[in-house]
Amino acid sequence: MAAPSPSLIKIVAPIKPVPFKRVMTSGKRRFNSARYSQFKDALGFFALKAMHGQEPLQGAIKLSAEFYKRRKGILTGQWGDVDNFLKAVLDSLNGICYLDDGQVVQVSAVKKFGEPRVLIELEELQ
């Protein structure tokens, strides 16, 4: 089977979405939470698989993301802000799908109920 078009990348990550949280400090040391670091590593793994050995995208990028959680409670409130989920995705894909998240010029994101997962579509704009 041929690799997908290098200007369109689809990532399906069957992992629970984790929002970005501010970097924690301990004395002079700065670190992310273990949960956030594990999410970034896992999403990076699925992104590498989706790249099929391609080089990172070079141009302006449109990013669409869907974040799914099991139906418990409501989509608003304590589950996390959609912009923090996006920040986690942008950080995770740096150097894998694109050289720098500054290349992302258009975003779309939604939180939904369903089997926990993250769906991402990246399209290089002409």
State the predicted function of each range.
Residues 1-126:
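Acidic, proline/glycine-enriched N-terminal capping motif
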